[in-house]
Regions:
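A boundary/linker detector
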Residues: 1-40, 85-114
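Alpha-helical and His/Cys-centered functional microenvironments
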Residues: 6, 48-49, 74, 81
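Residue-level detector of alpha-helix boundaries and kinks
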Residues: 16-19, 50, 79
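Short, surface-exposed beta-edge/turn micro-motifs
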Residues: 28-29, 60-62
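Pocket-edge structural micro-motifs
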Residues: 35, 50, 66
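Short Cys/His-centered divalent metal-binding micro-motifs
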Residues: 38, 61-87
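Short hydrophobic beta-strand that contains or immediately precedes a catalytic carboxylate
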Residues: 43
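Short linker/helix segments within small regulatory modules
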Residues: 47-61
Length: 114
């Protein structure tokens, strides 16, 4: 028996791994921040911890090069300002794509990054 396909609020399919297509990029071969493609890329959920699954379903994730933009000192896990900038950008895009107000975003993701 086949599993029923799940879809997010935009009608985009959610894969078996829990991810919908990113709404931030359609280029999964290059780092979202630096544009390089010659390095290992990680899938980074913009809003982690309690909001990780929502980020996956809503398409709020980006590919990042592992050593520099994801885990490095200047990356989102080593640089709080870089992480805030990415969260702000993702919030703006989510509000535009889903038609959410700032309050609706806050209700879904716990706070506003604007």
């Amino acid at each position: 028996m086949q599993k029923a396909m799940k879809y997010n609020a935009l009608g985009k399919p959610i894969g078996e791994n829990g991810y919908a297509d990113s709404i931030l990029t359609d280029d999964y071969e290059h780092c979202f921040l630096c544009g390089r493609c010659d390095r290992k890329l990680d899938r980074h959920e913009v809003y982690g911890n309690a909001y990780r699954n929502k980020s996956k379903v809503d398409g709020l994730w980006v590919p990042l090069c592992h050593d520099t933009c994801h885990e490095g000192r200047s990356g989102v896990h080593g640089n709080a300002q870089k992480a805030r900038e990415l969260r702000r950008l993702a919030q703006i895009e989510a509000m535009n794509v889903f038609g959410w107000t700032e309050e609706q975003f806050r209700m879904r993701y716990g706070k506003s990054y604007l």
